[in-house]
């Protein structure tokens, strides 16, 4: 089930590590090691409990697919995840630039 099918906002941290581990079929220690190397960054409560959002869970699922299905090592996963994020940011900037261009074109035609 995807995070966008839930009434909880995708970025809201609500799931404890034990729940996340069961949801995606990973050992809690594996999730902790992914956190240590920066592949996922869960929210921490005042009591230092990890809370994961739907976005975090999707990220962990992506990491799991890359490692288990494609045989990518963790350093490679990190590079892929960073590049994917950069591409998403560039796509957003491109969309914004195109919208601004279209506004300018629309304004000069009148």
Where are these regions (language model features)?
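C-terminal regulatory/oligomerization modules of transcriptional regulators
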Residues: 1-7, 85-110
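Residue-identity detector for glycine
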Residues: 25, 38, 47, 71, ...
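Basic helix-turn-helix/winged-helix DNA-binding cores
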Residues: 1-63
């Amino acid at each position: 089930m995807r995070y966008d099918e839930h009434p909880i906002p995708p970025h809201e941290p609500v799931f404890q590590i034990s729940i996340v581990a069961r949801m995606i079929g990973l050992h809690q220690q594996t999730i902790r090691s992914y956190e240590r190397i920066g592949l996922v960054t869960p929210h921490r409560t005042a009591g230092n409990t990890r809370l994961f959002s739907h976005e975090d869970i999707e990220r962990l699922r992506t990491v799991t697919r890359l490692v288990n299905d494609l045989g990518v090592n963790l350093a490679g996963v990190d590079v892929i995840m960073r590049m994917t994020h950069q591409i998403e940011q560039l796509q957003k900037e491109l969309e914004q630039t195109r919208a601004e261009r279209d506004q300018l074109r629309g304004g000069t035609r009148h």
